[in-house]
Every structure is written in C-alpha cells, then in structure tokens.
C-alpha cells in the first residue's frame, strides 16, 4: 500500500507543481507569457506524464474526485479511498508550499489568488457561484467518463494517459475563465492554504462539486455506457 500512496503523493505533487506553477510563474510573464492555453496544456501534460510514470502502481488518480468515481464504478476498493485522499491532499499541499516559496522570491510578490479557485469576486471572469457549481459538476462527470472509458477493456491498450491528459486540457480551456478550473479537490486545497483567506472560504464548492460530478460520471458509465 505504501508504494500506491507514494505514487499518489508524487503524482498529485507534480500536477499541482506543474499545473499551478505554470499559472503562477509563467502565465503572465512579460511578452512571453503562456496564457490560458499554456496553463491548460501544462495541467494536461502533468497528468499524462505521471500516468505513464506511476499509473501502473496506483492507477494514477492524483485527484480525490477521480478516486471516488473509480470507487463508485468498482475500480478502487472502498477501503483505499480515504488513504488515497490523504496522500493526494498532502502532495498538493507540499507542491503549493514550494511554489509559494519560489514565487515569493520575486520582488513585489503578493499571494493574491495564487492560482486558487473561486467564484464571484474570485472568478477570473466574474462568474456566479451557481455557474461555478454547474461547470465543475459537469466537467468532473465527463472527466470520470473519459477515465473509465479510456481505461476499460474495450479501449486500445496504452493510450489512456493521452486521452485523460487531453481531456484535462480541454476541461481547463473551457473553465479557467469561470472558476480557474478545479475538478480536483486536492489541487484546490493545496493552493487555497497559501492564497488570500477568501480562497479558503470558497473551498467548499471545490470539494462538493467535483465529488458530486464524480459520482454522476461513474453512475452514467456503469448504467449506460460501460460493459467492463
């Protein structure tokens, strides 16, 4: 079990360090900033690379919502769910802490949002709580469907990380303006702990919506789509 939890810790660390790090350090870099597209690609690439690296050890979840969805779908034993969540959240916090130290090394640094998720005043586009709730539920549900489908016995072998990585990239392209994209409670928790206090006050949504979406996605797959 230790090797599985270690894989989830380091996989989630890489997701937050690479994805949120690209948003914090590189998205708006003068003249050469990578922008929304670059950040979306960064998140997708973190999952793709670590899924190939450690997916064979733990399943490559790196996300409490994914672990819940796979539990509902019968792919992860229920007894493993909470240990996976703990490893994922700790990995996210460790990555966010290091990003905070790196980012604070620049003159004029302000924690600000620190790539945190939010709605209302904390939404990049000023979207409401309801908009944030809906988009996070819907996108997480589809993310679970992508994961379950691409890792099923019916899918071509060896290509699941590519589908999952590109799926997460698309999710970010759609929802960065709305919530700064979560679909991952661990990712949201890690950076919220080091951002402005307001981010913590809205963190509940980025647990509730992805977890609800994960259950919906798993039910859709099991009831309507899956045969494995």
Swiss-Prot record:
Localization terms from the record: Cell inner membrane
Location of the motif NPA 1: 63-65
Involved in tetramerization or stability of the tetramer, annotated site positions: 20
TM annotation in the entry: 1-21, 23-43, 82-102, 129-149, 154-174, 205-225
Membrane-related topology note: Multi-pass membrane protein
A GO cellular component entry from the record: plasma membrane
Quaternary structure and interacting proteins, as annotated: Homotetramer.
Similarity comment: Belongs to the MIP/aquaporin (TC 1.A.8) family.
Function recorded in the entry: Channel that permits osmotically driven movement of water in both directions. It is involved in the osmoregulation and in the maintenance of cell turgor during volume expansion in rapidly growing cells. It mediates rapid entry or exit of water in response to abrupt changes in osmolarity.
Descriptive protein name: Aquaporin Z
